[in-house]
Regions:
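Short helix-to-turn junction characteristic of helix-turn-helix DNA-binding domains
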Residues: 1, 5, 115-116
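The alpha-helix within a helix-turn-helix
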Residues: 5, 16, 126
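Conserved tyrosine-mediated DNA breakage-rejoining catalytic core shared by Y-recombinases
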Residues: 8, 12-13, 17-58
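Short, polar N-cap/turn motifs at the start of nucleic acid-interacting alpha helices
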Residues: 23-25, 81, 99-101, 120-141
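Catalytic-site neighborhood detector that most strongly recognizes the C-terminal catalytic loop/helix
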Residues: 34, 129-154
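C-terminal catalytic core of Y-nucleophile DNA break-rejoin enzymes
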Residues: 35-55, 68-90
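Short, basic (Lys/Arg/His-rich) helix/loop patches that form interaction surfaces
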Residues: 43, 86-127
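C-terminal secondary-structure termini that scaffold catalytic or DNA-interacting sites
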Residues: 155-163
Length: 163
């Protein structure tokens, strides 16, 4: 669930709402049926995420979880609440020795930032995140990049001798 949230850029509510019928492992895609604003979108998955998702679906099947249950559920098919995930992530981060604040939406931010660093056009990032416009995505990325911009400015040199 955590890897999918990070590697797909989905909101935690979108991840928890996924049904097995929304996942196409052969094509490496999943469908968000009701994203923010009740919008539907298709998201691609990299091979590593697809493999992890396949492993989880195999575990579900092994435990007899009904196909009508959401992809991420209890082993009895019960739903997982967003608040559970919100409390789980900081605990997992602490046990991994991560001191920085960790929250579900930070995984979405990391996904967007990584796509930008890998050279994805802002229109592609917008579509994958399900944003209504590139301006929303740009604000999203600029807010994330503020620390980098400050660090870049701090590292600049000014050679007064050349003046």
């Amino acid at each position: 669930m955590i890897a999918l949230t990070w590697r797909s850029g989905l909101r935690i509510g979108e991840v928890l709402a996924l049904k097995p019928k929304d996942v196409d492992l052969d094509s490496g895609t999943l469908v968000v049926q009701h994203g923010k604003g009740n919008k539907r979108r298709v998201v691609g998955l990299d091979a590593g995420t697809t493999a992890l998702l396949q492993r989880w679906l195999d575990v579900r099947a092994k435990h007899g979880v009904a196909r009508r249950a959401t992809v991420f559920c209890t082993l009895r098919g019960g739903s997982i609440d967003q608040s559970y995930v919100r409390h789980l992530l900081p605990r997992l981060a602490a046990s991994a020795g991560i001191e920085k604040r960790v929250h579900a939406h930070a995984l979405r931010h990391a996904y967007a930032t990584e796509l930008e660093r890998e050279g994805a056009p802002i229109s592609t990032i917008r579509d994958l995140l399900g944003h209504s416009s590139a301006a929303v995505t740009d604000r999203y990325l600029r807010r994330l990049g503020a620390g980098e911009a400050v660090e870049f400015a701090r590292q600049r040199t000014w050679a007064l001798d050349a003046v």
